[in-house]
């Protein structure tokens, strides 16, 4: 969208972003709609055995109620890429403590700025965040498709939200 707005809430251990408009994509030939976007720090998933600076989780639902999570690793790298710009338009505008939702108007802002055209992994598993139950289709992009965030935005993010508490990997697909 040329001009978009987002409702952003600091949930204490993640940022919750509700995007305007109807954002629909195809997954396995079925339309799925974005319900919200979350930003955590550091990442839930491990890349080369290590967490990345942050992880973006885009949540989708289809008409049957099935969930799809698209997970994108985020690394600290200063620059002027689309993903650097994406984070720079929202992170400096967030309240410094748990807050009621804030409406942030942004220009030239799109989730396409952080979703890579890269290889990904797919599995069916429980949600990687509380309550760590339920079942979702989960796409995880590899570290070669990582979004980049300016180091100053990462430092701000680290002061805004608590780090996730990494625990042992969740059971994948009920195995």
Region spans (language model):
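Alpha-carbonic anhydrase
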Residues: 1-175
């Amino acid at each position: 969208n040329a001009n978009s707005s987002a409702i952003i809430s600091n949930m204490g251990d993640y940022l919750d972003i509700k995007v305007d408009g109807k954002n629909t994509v195809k997954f396995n030939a079925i339309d799925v709609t974005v319900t919200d976007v979350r930003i955590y720090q550091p990442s839930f998933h491990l890349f080369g055995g290590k967490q990345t600076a942050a992880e973006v989780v885009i949540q989708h639902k289809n008409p049957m109620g099935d969930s799809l999570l698209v997970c994108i690793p985020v690394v600290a790298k200063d620059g002027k890429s689309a993903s650097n710009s994406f984070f720079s338009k929202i992170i400096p505008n967030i309240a410094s403590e748990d807050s009621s939702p804030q409406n942030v108007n942004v220009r030239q802002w799109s989730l396409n700025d952080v979703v890579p055209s890269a290889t990904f992994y797919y599995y069916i598993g429980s949600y990687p965040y509380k309550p760590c139950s339920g079942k979702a289709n989960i796409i995880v992009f590899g570290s070669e498709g990582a979004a980049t965030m300016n180091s100053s935005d990462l430092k701000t993010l680290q002061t805004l939200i608590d780090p996730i508490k990494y625990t042992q990997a969740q059971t994948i697909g009920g195995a």
